[in-house]
Amino acid sequence: MSSASRSLARLAALALAALAAAPLAASAQPKAARGKTEVTWYGHAAFVVTTPGGTVLAIDPWLSNPKAPEPGLAGKLPKVDYILVSHGHFDHVGDAIAIAKRTGAKLITNFDLGSSLVAAGYPKDQAGMDTLGNMGGTIQAGDAAVTMVTAVHSSGFTDEKGTGHPGGNPMGFVIQVKGGPTIYHTGDTDLTQDMKQLPERFGRVDVMLTCIGGHFTMDPKAAAIAVGYVHPRTVVPMHFGTFPAIAGTPDELRAALKGKAEVRVLEPGKPVGF
């Protein structure tokens, strides 16, 4: 075999090896099964959304909450691209800083809270003007668009030393997945007339992740009214039962809805496709 033939043979072998490796590299990225968007509840208001394109969004990642399916989850998530924090309270900021340091996840929240989280240790280069915003703003997050929408609550942030910092305005999130569902995470909120505008602005909401616990947020009766404003295909209750004070239940939500919407209670740690 001539030197030219040997070179061509080596190139062909390298090309075949690259083609064989390509599926392995692709499979290392967490993509939702069969082109669906996977939503995993980790208890309280904490969710991880994985899009068909492999973008991973962690919402209000208090993964050490009492309903979490196992301990140490903040150190076990294989990939997080973006962390969405609805407001500054400890049970929503949760493990955001630890997850960000380990995964390189960018922060999506209001500008004031973002600045306070950076001061508390969130990596500054992962919390810039490209992902910090405010009410009404839309952030492109891979193959998902995240819009910050109204929530009626409070948002003070207290760091590990007990020092208070500005938390900006609380918010919910509307996540529009390219070629996939529109997901509305209410954040912590009371019933608000602004919810009526969501279908006009975003079209049909496929999945509404709604607080129902009461005391600090809507109770099941108010959440049922909110569902009537938004008209989602599926309602997923959250922010209930973590503490004795937030005593609203999914059964109470179902009763208040009177069959007007599907209520789907997720099992912590088990992904569900939409």
UniProtKB/Swiss-Prot annotation:
GO terms assigned for molecular function: hydrolase activity
Protein name: UPF0173 metal-dependent hydrolase Adeh_1068
UniProt KW keywords: Hydrolase
Highest taxon in the source lineage: Bacteria
Source organism of this protein record: Anaeromyxobacter dehalogenans (strain 2CP-C)
UniProt cross-references to PANTHER family, sorted A to Z: UPF0173 METAL-DEPENDENT HYDROLASE MJ1163, UPF0173 METAL-DEPENDENT HYDROLASE MJ1163-RELATED
SMART domains given in the database record: Lactamase_B
Family: Belongs to the UPF0173 family.
